[in-house]
């Protein structure tokens, strides 16, 4: 199984996340059989994330200093876009990142 992490940060755009969950979700249903086993999970430094236009998301996995090495097990890391600079660069300053 391939594992893909989508990193959520304050100000992320919902449609930028949806494109990945939709593509890989449909791939698991109608894609070529040898590529169907993909698991997508959302990760962040905190449980609740506020999106650009007021939506709120809950991360499936929370990154902490104690478990940061577990996140090296993902096969790919997706960093979706946000409005302007959003707050990705604030999260980028997090010493865990």
Predicted regions mapped to residue ranges:
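Extended, subdomain-level signal for the structured scaffold at the beginning of enzyme domains
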Residues: 1-97
């Amino acid at each position: 199984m391939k594992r893909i992490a989508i990193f959520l940060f304050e100000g992320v755009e919902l449609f930028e996340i949806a494109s990945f969950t939709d593509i890989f979700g449909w791939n698991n249903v109608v894609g070529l059989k040898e590529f169907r086993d993909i698991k997508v999970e959302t990760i962040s430094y905190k449980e609740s994330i506020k999106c650009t236009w007021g939506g709120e998301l809950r991360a499936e996995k929370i990154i902490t200093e104690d478990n940061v090495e577990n996140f090296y097990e993902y096969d790919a890391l997706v960093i979706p876009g946000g409005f302007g600079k959003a707050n990705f660069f604030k999260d980028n300053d997090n010493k865990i990142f």
